[in-house]
């Protein structure tokens, strides 16, 4: 047995402490290790793979866990972006961590909190919790009552959730230690209340909500310690708050994208700690002089614009400016000249003077005056001369001169002057001539947009070799010709190529080297030959070669490419359709206006949202398609399809547009079509911005220092390169053929069975399509009555029943249709009075021609009460008194003609004076003809 003296004991203890410190920290306690293992069930295994059940495993060394180095207690849990499925969190799971200071559940998939034992007091068990990040989850107001118990909180982040209603002051009143509060990106509304109890707040972010009203003394102005305030993207109104003059510690103020109005007051000059001031996208008016902010010596970022077009910025100033700006943003300010004071702002790194009335020469003046400039945005002005300094080599990264009035050749030295450019947008101008070969010196260029100009010729070989970092290239709407890329080509980083509406004739195989290509748009060129088989080597999301001269069959290599959109329309492709394509979820397949033949494969609808096979040479019957609840658009018009309309179409319940026109379909219309939605029940709602095909956001790291080190604002200048599929549906409605895209297709629901061989009555069940906007059953052999149930088509705009054999009256209740523009029943056998109320007043006579028994003021034909054929029938009567029995009519007509001819023949068979007289008459007539 060892016996230690007191000095020896303290020495041993000291050695133990030192050894532990040398190890970094002691092991975590067992209670917390078990607590972490309970949490593991809610964390994606990918992020908790080292959370081991082994009792020898030190949880302080586990990923996403932070422990105190001295006590070994867990003080930080960083579970952000680790969820597997949306969950309701039991807060008692965190109770073992009594020393917890930071709990990061950002993007954790949390839908709410609960604690069956401690209830709303649950967070009070975490007495040292200082930072709680619940950003970008799915929680609503149900979590708010839990917050008052967390009185130790200094940072509370709730942005990007589903909070709604007014500012939750009641639930936050006990959080008197809060220094940062982020409620951005929710659904909060109403005025901002008094916040005196949150007097320690340094940073407050209320952006991207719908807060409204004016800002008075009882609200934000009580927060004297406030350093950062973000009110952007709300609905605040009224003038700039005078009481903001008391917020003397304010360093960041963002009031952009609201409805603030009036003139900008002098109190802004009192905010002498400001580094970042954004007043853009409001309704300020009057004259603004930079003298107003001349004394803000710390100001680095200034942004101002107005929605009202009544804001005018004075170009000249009288005071000496004390600030040295890094960022100036004056878009939408009605500027006719560059403000003179900018010449002294040599530290500028970002200039945005877009959407003004600037003219003259650009961008040489800016490049010569601002050696530190990294971003120059001058889009939508009236510059006419594109000039660059001859000997200067500039470090500019971003240049946007789109939508101006340049109409000359691009400078030959553009690549020499701008070798560091990464983003260049010269679109929507009138640039002419060939592409300068000096583009090849832009080794860092990532994005190049030359679309909508008059550029011509072929792409230079040096360009295709030198721009090795190019990822997005837009050449559409020019006059480029020849091969798309000459050999050799080293655009290995190319992901997006948009070159539609040019005169290219050939796709060369050098494109094989661009392995990351996901978006290829080559429509409306003069491409010839077949689709290259090596297209199958790409991981395509978007491929469009429509409106070219391509022919042959679809190469089998394309069948397994993961498309989101494939458009081969308006070419000369032939052969049978493949049995399937490997579409991602909700793909778009356009094969219309080709020469495809054979049957329609039943498997084509797998993972497809739209199938367009219009105007081919397809034959056979419509197959029983594989069921697909996401399938919305089926377009088979203009083929040679035969047989009945299959009842299996009724299983495609989400259909919005069904076009089977101009085929040879026969039989009757299936009544079960009322199972199809046509917008009646939108169980599945499509986003009009569906299908982001390529999405990239790039930040310019060198601009980071241009923004204040803000807790609530982005630190970088970012460019969003998201691209969207042009989702288009062509459909005949209101006597014309229209293309629906963007927001418009969201409201298009239609059915077209016209120009077939359909018979039988129109099913009354078609009246269940309450949201349908266009219904065309014309040019068939449909019989019976116009269904009275059509009065239930409350959103209908166009009904075409022309060229059928319908009879009976036009139901009077159709006058209830408030949006009807076309009601064409011409060339039928309808009878009775034409309705003349509501929208029917504006319908002209062409809608009714070919119906001899119709009458009314619309066709200027009176109705005779004594003629049963002209009587208006009670739409609710079961007896059709005016209806003509067409079968009896045709049999009577046939019998009359038959009996007449038989009598005439019998008459000629008997010898009589009448017979002799008849033959003499015939002889006289023949002699007369000979004389003539």
From Swiss-Prot:
<keyword id="KW-0433">Leucine-rich repeat</keyword>
<feature type="repeat" description="LRR 21">
    <location>
        <begin position="585"/>
        <end position="605"/>
    </location>
</feature>
<feature type="glycosylation site" description="N-linked (GlcNAc...) asparagine">
    <location>
        <position position="425"/>
    </location>
</feature>
<keyword id="KW-0675">Receptor</keyword>
<feature type="repeat" description="LRR 20">
    <location>
        <begin position="561"/>
        <end position="583"/>
    </location>
</feature>
<feature type="repeat" description="LRR 10">
    <location>
        <begin position="322"/>
        <end position="345"/>
    </location>
</feature>
<feature type="repeat" description="LRR 26">
    <location>
        <begin position="770"/>
        <end position="792"/>
    </location>
</feature>
<feature type="repeat" description="LRR 12">
    <location>
        <begin position="370"/>
        <end position="393"/>
    </location>
</feature>
<feature type="repeat" description="LRR 13">
    <location>
        <begin position="394"/>
        <end position="417"/>
    </location>
</feature>
<dbReference type="InterPro" id="IPR003591">
    <property type="entry name" value="Leu-rich_rpt_typical-subtyp"/>
</dbReference>
<feature type="repeat" description="LRR 24">
    <location>
        <begin position="653"/>
        <end position="676"/>
    </location>
</feature>
<feature type="repeat" description="LRR 18">
    <location>
        <begin position="516"/>
        <end position="535"/>
    </location>
</feature>
<protein>
    <recommendedName>
        <fullName>Receptor-like protein 9a</fullName>
    </recommendedName>
</protein>
<feature type="glycosylation site" description="N-linked (GlcNAc...) asparagine">
    <location>
        <position position="824"/>
    </location>
</feature>
<feature type="repeat" description="LRR 8">
    <location>
        <begin position="275"/>
        <end position="295"/>
    </location>
</feature>
<feature type="glycosylation site" description="N-linked (GlcNAc...) asparagine">
    <location>
        <position position="352"/>
    </location>
</feature>
<dbReference type="InterPro" id="IPR051502">
    <property type="entry name" value="RLP_Defense_Trigger"/>
</dbReference>
<feature type="repeat" description="LRR 5">
    <location>
        <begin position="202"/>
        <end position="222"/>
    </location>
</feature>
<feature type="glycosylation site" description="N-linked (GlcNAc...) asparagine">
    <location>
        <position position="860"/>
    </location>
</feature>
<feature type="repeat" description="LRR 15">
    <location>
        <begin position="443"/>
        <end position="466"/>
    </location>
</feature>
<feature type="repeat" description="LRR 17">
    <location>
        <begin position="492"/>
        <end position="514"/>
    </location>
</feature>
<keyword id="KW-0732">Signal</keyword>
<feature type="repeat" description="LRR 22">
    <location>
        <begin position="606"/>
        <end position="629"/>
    </location>
</feature>
<keyword id="KW-1133">Transmembrane helix</keyword>
<dbReference type="GO" id="GO:0005886">
    <property type="term" value="C:plasma membrane"/>
</dbReference>
<dbReference type="Pfam" id="PF00560">
    <property type="entry name" value="LRR_1"/>
</dbReference>
<dbReference type="Pfam" id="PF08263">
    <property type="entry name" value="LRRNT_2"/>
</dbReference>
<feature type="glycosylation site" description="N-linked (GlcNAc...) asparagine">
    <location>
        <position position="829"/>
    </location>
</feature>
<feature type="glycosylation site" description="N-linked (GlcNAc...) asparagine">
    <location>
        <position position="666"/>
    </location>
</feature>
<feature type="glycosylation site" description="N-linked (GlcNAc...) asparagine">
    <location>
        <position position="560"/>
    </location>
</feature>
<feature type="glycosylation site" description="N-linked (GlcNAc...) asparagine">
    <location>
        <position position="380"/>
    </location>
</feature>
<feature type="glycosylation site" description="N-linked (GlcNAc...) asparagine">
    <location>
        <position position="551"/>
    </location>
</feature>
<feature type="glycosylation site" description="N-linked (GlcNAc...) asparagine">
    <location>
        <position position="140"/>
    </location>
</feature>
<feature type="transmembrane region" description="Helical">
    <location>
        <begin position="889"/>
        <end position="909"/>
    </location>
</feature>
<feature type="repeat" description="LRR 28">
    <location>
        <begin position="819"/>
        <end position="842"/>
    </location>
</feature>
<feature type="glycosylation site" description="N-linked (GlcNAc...) asparagine">
    <location>
        <position position="295"/>
    </location>
</feature>
<keyword id="KW-0472">Membrane</keyword>
<keyword id="KW-1003">Cell membrane</keyword>
<feature type="glycosylation site" description="N-linked (GlcNAc...) asparagine">
    <location>
        <position position="792"/>
    </location>
</feature>
<feature type="glycosylation site" description="N-linked (GlcNAc...) asparagine">
    <location>
        <position position="454"/>
    </location>
</feature>
<feature type="repeat" description="LRR 1">
    <location>
        <begin position="97"/>
        <end position="122"/>
    </location>
</feature>
<feature type="topological domain" description="Extracellular">
    <location>
        <begin position="29"/>
        <end position="888"/>
    </location>
</feature>
